[in-house]
Amino acid sequence: MKDRMGREIDYMRFSITDRCNLRCKYCMPDGIDCMPRWDVLALEEFEAIAIAAASLGIKKIKVTGGEPLARKSCPQLVKMLKNIPGIEKVTLTTNGVQLAQYLDQLLDAGLDAVNISLDTVDPVLYEKITGRDKLSEVMKVIEKAEDLPVPVKINAVSIDFRQLQTGTKTAGLSPQENWQQVAELAKRYPVDVRFIEMMPIGYGRQFKTIDHNWLLENMKKTYPDLAVDSTVHGFGPAVYYKASGFKGSIGLISAIHGKFCSSCNRVRLTSQGHVKSCLCYDEGTDLRSILREGQERPEEDTHYIWQAGRDVRDEKLQEKLREALARAIYEKPAAHCFEKPGEITEAHNMISIGG
């Protein structure tokens, strides 16, 4: 369906957990408490929302977290979403640490593509950023990308990480050195490497994003024959470039310095069941209250269990979900205001909103 600005909204991101096995400094550093288990949607609740979304024209769903594979039932959810009429693509964004373990299950479930979040290929810096020594686990999947039946993309946040490196043997690894090392993955493997400007939300406010105008200028100096790649790579806002000898492409997602709000096609669903139509604003439509109408929170914190015999396609339930979701989509803000920090009203961290 179209929002009030006439934009076609056909893409939804489902955050299925706020838990993660890494502790990235700009997202979920040590010391953050996870939300109560009961607050997180059950698989059937995601399914019910996806059915309503599909009836409104949502065709593509990205499963995210937190780290979605921290939820062992992630492959089951992918299969459930793929079986919904109208949902054409289901993809996954993961930090890649457990991807090799779950890859066969995800492919059997019908997963269409995978994005791996990876900000550096330097082992020491990786551990500084994430708090974990897990780079080798991530590289296992990237190194066999050529043999996979689905596209693989690498997402790297554009930050000057030197502020994390004081006292390490890689202290001073410059943005130029870091982005080039990551970009080389697209040369060695058939993967698209996308650099993403840091969203000034939550802990991300402490880190200054690298201007993608600077990055593109340096890319052109490093790869003189770099040219725009007009091939369709997905359904996101990245602008892609290709250099000779590269198996993959390099993409720039420039939310700050290349504002693309006029063509934004997405809304987000948090793991708590709130629809967010723009990352910049602390506004959301509560779908969980519709799904759990009349049910009381238990005294003990346990996972919410969908009631046996309750139909996710119940027409009254679906009507309420469609009405609330349609309102959230229609009222999507015209644009973010990330370039004006004083006007940003979103106070939550990305880990609780969803990547």
Tell me what each language-model feature is.
Residues 4-43, 56:
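Canonical Radical SAM [4Fe-4S] cluster-binding loop centered on the CxxxCxxC motif
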Residues 16, 20, 63, 92, ...:
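Conserved, mostly hydrophobic/aromatic
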Residues 32-36, 122-129, 202-206, 286-288:
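A short acidic, helix-capping loop that chelates divalent metal ions and anchors anionic groups
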Residues 40-63, 70-192:
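Radical SAM/AdoMet-radical enzyme domain recognition
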